[in-house]
Amino acid sequence: MHLILSKVKDGKYSFVVSPVHIKETEVIPDEIEKNRLMALFEELGTKANIDLFRARQRAESLVNYGFGVADAAHVAFAEECGAKFITCDDRLLKKCKKHDISVWCDNPIMFCLTEKIQ
């Protein structure tokens, strides 16, 4: 992730922060980790202007496919803003590949290989 974030700092990529990122981070009990993540969102994050109603509808349909609520919200948000979806959660990736996810989904290593980031 550090390699990808360094490219975000350089302006090559955008790091889209969703309301789900914020909500998940707000409940982290470790104040140091929580503050570090919030600072990262503030420094590097971009807020996308999307149709939250459509994203919510899509998230609900993904939940019906067996996605967890937070995972469904992350994926729906990525779809709504047309962002590539990067996760380290192999089970989530398996679900994404099984269902009709309209954006690129994979792990950080595959993102770096696909984008030829070194």
Predicted regions and their residues:
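PIN/NYN-family metal-dependent endoribonuclease catalytic core
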Residues: 1-30
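Short, electropositive alpha-helical surface patch
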Residues: 28-42
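Short, surface-exposed amphipathic charged segments that create phosphate/polyanion-binding patches used
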Residues: 62-66, 116-118
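Mid-chain, well-packed structural core segment of small domains
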Residues: 58, 67-74, 83
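Residue-level signal for well-ordered alpha-helical positions
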Residues: 28, 62, 98-99
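Acidic, PIN/NYN-like endoribonuclease modules and their adjacent C-terminal/linker elements
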Residues: 7, 47, 75, 79-118
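Acidic catalytic patch
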Residues: 20-23, 41-64
